[in-house]
Amino acid sequence: MNWRTRFSAAEKKVDIVVIGTILKEIVHFPDGREIGPVIGSPVAYSSLVMAAQGVNVGIVTYYGGDMPEIIGELDMLDRRNMMPWEHTTTNMLMYREDGTKYINYIKKAPPIRYRDICRAFRACRYFKICPMDYEVEPKLARRLYREGKTVFVDLGGYGGATSDVRYSVEDAYGYKVVSTLCKNSTIVKASQEDLASIVPGRTAEEAARYLLELGARTAVVTCGGSGAFYSQAGREPVWFRPFKAVSEEANGKLDMTGAGDSFGGGFMASYIQNGDINAAMANGNCTASLVIQRSGGCTFKRMPTRERIARRAATGE
């Protein structure tokens, strides 16, 4: 497909720009099952989630010619800022019995800088920054925030569960990165697992409070089966219970791959409508509960529609 002609002049306005690397990924489960190679990464999951909910998503990433059979999963995104490279970032995603994960990187694409964002995308109001392993420079977030953009940053790729070397705030480099991002974003998001590496030795609520002390306006934290909460200065954390998820797979198991990224996508799909954080939290939880009912990696057909989410939110179905 010719991506330079796919979008007419009237279609070139995007609702949100998502920035970070995409992955050529093999997912390994504790029971020995493997799927892949599939497209993975926070960018891919959250972008497809938002697209399924009717959001026009622009993506800024590098990609190689090494996965022609699966790159088509991104066909419903505005891909004109996908930059060709000699290879796609390639990895093995390994899940442990307790649900935590680690990643073995095989190949990596280059870092993403502000100058890599095309002019049309720079005009967008909303940006979601969600790297895997520090590949999006923190000063990119600072530049966007100072331009008055609404900037959502997923900290998982800045020392959290997807990072190769996990620099915590106890390291000079880790502190500089996290404090820069907190000061130059509208919302920061992390999982409880991410925060165990980024802000070690603290509970999730304590870690969120620490992020606020570094300058974050709002800190959103996902906590698996316990739900999710957000913290803001001068307020107690506001918790949201998870929605009940029932597997649609023959083996009866939920697939947690992409759960946190799907929450982030569902959150932003709602947030860009009216800036209502409570509605966004509920939409994020509802979205994630539906995604984990299906397996198969990061595919558009796995992602719930706005109508399906509304039905679960209303009835629990």
Regions found by a protein language model. Give the residues of each.
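Alpha-helix C-terminal capping segments
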Residues: 47-56, 270-273
